[in-house]
């Protein structure tokens, strides 16, 4: 639920390495 400051419209979340995942075109961490 916390925004990771990254979008994932065209590319995946690079912040995935710190448990961030794509949701509604924005990367979130829980």
Curated annotation (Swiss-Prot):
One biological process term in Gene Ontology: defense response
**Highest taxon of the lineage:** Eukaryota
| UniProtKB keywords | Disulfide bond, Knottin, Plant defense
Q: In which tissues is it expressed?
A: Detected in stems (at protein level).
Which positions are linked by Cyclopeptide (Gly-Asn)? 1-30
PTM per Swiss-Prot/TrEMBL: This is a cyclic peptide.
What the entry says about domains is: The presence of a 'disulfide through disulfide knot' structurally defines this protein as a knottin.
Task: State the family it belongs to.
Answer: Belongs to the cyclotide family. Bracelet subfamily.
Write down what this protein is called. Answer: Cyclotide hyen-E
């Amino acid at each position: 639920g916390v925004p990771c400051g990254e979008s994932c419209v065209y590319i995946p979340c690079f912040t995935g390495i710190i448990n961030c995942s794509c949701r509604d075109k924005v990367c979130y961490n829980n």
